[in-house]
Amino acid sequence: MILTDRQPHRVEVTVLGEFELADFKQFETLFDEVLAGDAPVDLYFDLRGMAGFTVDVAWEEVVFSRQHGKDFRRIAVIAEHRWEAWAVWLTKLSAQAELRVFADEEGARSWLAGAL
């Protein structure tokens, strides 16, 4: 399950439990709506509540990153586990955005706002 929020130039996603393909499709739809307004888009991605992800999500993320790598400005990821940070690093290979991993929400939001 995911919780989402959209703002001008920003998509926010919080993952709770297992990240499944239907969740990723929901994120893609929201991203496309925000992108239609103006690019590039910032992404706030909170993975602290994620229990895992399905293989089809991993593949969809690779396809999405290659398709939209240039459409991001900054990607802030909140992660508690080393494997989550590693997965974020893989995303960086195909995204042209600035990407940082944070341990807390405040740091991530400040960075997206340009304060750090």
Where do the PLM segments sit?
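Amphipathic, Lys/Arg-enriched alpha-helical "gate/interface" segment within cytosolic domains
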Residues: M1-L116
